[in-house]
């Protein structure tokens, strides 16, 4: 699991 990618996706949603 790429946490960096998840973090970027979450930032985009937020």
Swiss-Prot record:
Signal peptide: none
Keywords of the record: Ion channel impairing toxin, Neurotoxin, Postsynaptic neurotoxin, Secreted, Toxin
Tissue expression: Expressed by the venom gland.
Subcellular location: Secreted
Annotated Gene Ontology cellular component terms: extracellular region; host cell postsynaptic membrane
GO molecular function, one term: toxin activity
Superkingdom: Eukaryota
Family of this protein: Belongs to the MCD family. Mastoparan subfamily.
Function (record text): Toxin active in modulation of gamma-aminobutyric acid (GABA) neurotransmission. Increases GABA release and inhibits GABA uptake in synaptosomes from rat cerebral cortex. May acts on GABA transporters, since its action on GABA uptake and GABA release is not altered by the presence of calcium, sodium and potassium channel blockers. May also modulate GABA(A) receptors, since it significantly decreases GABA-binding in synaptic membranes from rat brain cortex.
Protein name, UniProt field: Agelaiatoxin-8
Organism: Agelaia vicina
């Amino acid at each position: 699991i790429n946490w960096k990618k998840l973090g970027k996706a979450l930032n985009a949603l937020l």
